[in-house]
């Protein structure tokens, strides 16, 4: 039987992140609402400076902090699986593989970035992180990351998903996060939306506005 799963050992986990910006010398800067390039100062009200520095960095390799690695070791390296049935369905001679990120505590690839983002917030002195989530995957990932790093976490979850996916909410709460249906009466913007559309299912844009 052909091998359908490739599983590396913990010693093979990467110790550095690769920054693709180093190999994209003509990469255009992100633009703000006015159509002009965003400066670090414009991001400072939302993100800590050490994360902003990475956002604009052109350094090719960035060392992964040991505290981050210690958390990632709980499920990484994730297995590489061969999609034999998909190959058969497509009638292709190609070998198709996919990275199985369902093995993470939150069940997706999102803890891979949630953990380092929470870590760098902690290093900067942040005690509480507020975020938004649509269907709940990102909220679950950040709730998990904050639980591992001793941070408070508040998540505004799009109301329709909040109602339809109670187990995602439960998962976030098990990790100590405060999960709130958005729009909510906790923010000025949320109250404005509820007044205009009391039966709104919410949207990711509304949740982002409440979190910010």
Locations of the language-model features?
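PLP-dependent amino-acid enzyme catalytic core
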Residues: 1-212
């Amino acid at each position: 039987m052909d091998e359908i799963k490739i599983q590396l050992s913990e010693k093979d986990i990467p110790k550095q992140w690769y920054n693709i910006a180093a190999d994209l010398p003509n990469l255009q800067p992100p633009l703000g609402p006015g159509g002009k390039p965003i400066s670090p100062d414009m991001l400072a009200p939302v993100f800590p400076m050490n994360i902003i520095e990475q956002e604009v960095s052109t350094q090719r390799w960035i060392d992964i902090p040991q505290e981050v690695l210690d958390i990632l070791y709980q499920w990484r390296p994730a297995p590489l699986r061969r999609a034999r049935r998909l190959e058969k369905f497509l009638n292709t001679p190609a070998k198709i593989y996919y990275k199985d990120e369902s093995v993470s505590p939150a069940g997706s690839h999102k803890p891979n970035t949630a953990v380092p983002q929470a870590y760098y917030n902690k290093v900067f002195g942040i005690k509480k992180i507020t975020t938004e989530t649509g269907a709940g995957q990102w909220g679950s990932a950040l709730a998990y990351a904050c639980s591992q790093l001793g941070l408070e976490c508040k998540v505004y979850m799009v109301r329709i998903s909040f109602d339809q996916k109670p187990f995602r909410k439960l998962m976030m709460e098990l990790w100590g996060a405060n999960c709130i249906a958005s729009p909510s009466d906790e923010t000025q913007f949320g109250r404005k939306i509820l007044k205009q559309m009391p039966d709104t299912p919410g949207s990711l844009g509304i949740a982002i506005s409440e979190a910010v």
